[in-house]
Amino acid sequence: MAFKKLLAVLTAALSLRAAQGAAVEKRATCSNGKVVPAASCCTWFNVLSDIQENLFNGGQCGAEAHESIRLVFHDAIAISPAMEPQASSVRGADGSIMIFDEIETNFHPNIGLDEIVRLQKPFVQKHGVTPGDFIAFAGAVALSNCPGAPQMNFFTGRAPATQPAPDGLVPEPFHSVDQIIDRVFDAGEFDELELVWMLSAHSVAAANDIDPNIQGLPFDSTPGIFDSQFFVETQLAGTGFTGGSNNQGEVSSPLPGEMRLQSDFLIARDARTACEWQSFVNNQSKLVSDFQFIFLALTQLGQDPDAMTDCSAVIPISKPAPNNTPGFSFFPPGMTMDDVEQACAETPFPTLSTLPGPATSVARIPPPPGA
């Protein structure tokens, strides 16, 4: 989405909040005493309690949270104005990946999402909410469970999808940078900088299906924290593979136990995106601000923001990220500036400290049940 469209989305959201704030009679007090912009938001507190206990294991930033965040992107990005009128009923963030899961979770880029869809479906049925709204809500709550994440926005009002999204709309890790930039521009006129913002989600992510023999390989050494360490470690020279070396979409990583996607490697080094990538290193405030912005835009792809209800008050506030160094980012033990493959020609790479101690392996994340 171009900046002017992103600004329009945010302006609409803020205008809606202002209108709701001015019309006091439209606000509601839920049974738990929380005041929300509309009575329809109250049901989401019940959903929140349920999924925190029974999906996210008491509010953890684990595999179920990671896959819920992934599901938001894979549902939303599957929209293509360029395919109109063939896909005229496909509305991006509409829950089609859950409604038509037997079709969409068999698409190659969606492999592995059938498990989180299976885990989420009973909550949709139990609470009587739409799949599109639930996917956005679960993703926002999942992020709130990860220390360092922004205060997430959540709007309701997504009608159920009436047809599955076409195949071929979700970027793959083996796609070229050109292909991925073109795909996100087609989906919502997102530019190359906003693509980098989206990939901030890989700060709290792991691969379950790139290597068929090993699941739960994190993309950075702090997969339970929403921080900029992902943007550091993707710029370090690769030294080996945790599993096999012939997996499509994987390149060598700098740390044992870590998975590096080919697409992340290339975007971190492409002239169009390298400086934006580097800009997140040691800059937690920018990371938080930009991701909050892009997450809202993704969850409203194909929707009319003016027709949606702001229920952001239901989303918990994340804990702050632990401050390992003054700026949050660091070099893993045994690594220094000499290991950086810097691609941004405009600004120097930030000065970072190296964590003390011997080099260690990144621990795997147990995948969701049934994965």
UniProtKB/Swiss-Prot annotation:
The active site is at H74. It comes from the Eukaryota. Glycans are attached at N283. The record marks R70 as: Transition state stabilizer. Pathway: Secondary metabolite metabolism; lignin degradation. Ca(2+) 2 binds at S203, D220, T222, I225, D227. Binds 2 calcium ions per subunit. Binds 1 heme b (iron(II)-protoporphyrin IX) group per subunit. Its EC number is 1.11.1.14. Depolymerization of lignin. Catalyzes the C(alpha)-C(beta) cleavage of the propyl side chains of lignin. This is Ligninase LG5.
